[in-house]
Amino acid sequence: MALLEICCYSMECALTAQQNGADRVELCAAPKEGGLTPSLGVLKSVRQRVTIPVHPIIRPRGGDFCYSDGEFAAILEDVRTVRELGFPGLVTGVLDVDGNVDMPRMEKIMAAAGPLAVTFHRAFDMCANPLYTLNNLAELGIARVLTSGQKSDALQGLSKIMELIAHRDAPIIMAGAGVRAENLHHFLDAGVLEVHSSAGAWQASPMRYRNQGLSMSSDEHADEYSRYIVDGAAVAEMKGIIERHQAK
């Protein structure tokens, strides 16, 4: 049966995902940045309360995946922290200036991660040569690759995802970006074994007083009185689709 991973941005969201049938959580901060390293407090609270596997993302900033020496030092420290806290896996990725996997840096990450299952995230979708990159990731011992097939969403990239799945000795290929209940059957019918979804919604802030003339964001149009949450009903619906597909 296909595995359902849900991207979560808080302990509460991780618990919601777990309660509604998620098989694994990718734990992140900063949804508008596409996911950054969670705080130590969030990591500890999730580790204590969530019982399904949780893989934190290790990404120090938004934007590209070519990092300064200081940023890379922070990545290694965060990898060590996640390992020490007892998480079973993590999610990360580093590219060089030419859009290839930065092999020397990824080798250091793999050494720091030790026995943890490492997912190479959607930095893969920004690489110059996906099949060459897939070979490099297999050589590193990467457990899985999260990808949209190098398109803006995974449904558009499904043909590339299928090509990657068919590649000999490839890591597990996990489809992600725009995967939701209404299109999930396309991925299941194609033989995708792991799917990644935010199953998310924006929830209004409980604050009654709102200073509408002030923004804490560099984006003056950002709605600071809404929060990104996991929609438990959406998770349960996706899990049900997977179970029914398996029973066919």
Curated annotation (Swiss-Prot):
Pfam families named in the record: CutC
InterPro entries, per database record: CutC-like (IPR005627), CutC-like_dom_sf (IPR036822)
GO molecular function: copper ion binding
UniProt entry keywords in alphabetical sequence: Cytoplasm
UniProt entry tagged with the keyword Cytoplasm: yes
Domain of life: Bacteria
SUPFAM superfamilies reported for this sequence: CutC-like
Subcellular location, record wording: Cytoplasm
GO cellular component: cytoplasm
Family recorded in the similarity comment: Belongs to the CutC family.
NCBIfam families the record matches: PRK11572.1
Self-association state and partner proteins as the record states: Homodimer.
This protein's name: PF03932 family protein CutC
Species of the source: Shigella flexneri
Taxonomic lineage from the root: Bacteria, Pseudomonadati, Pseudomonadota, Gammaproteobacteria, Enterobacterales
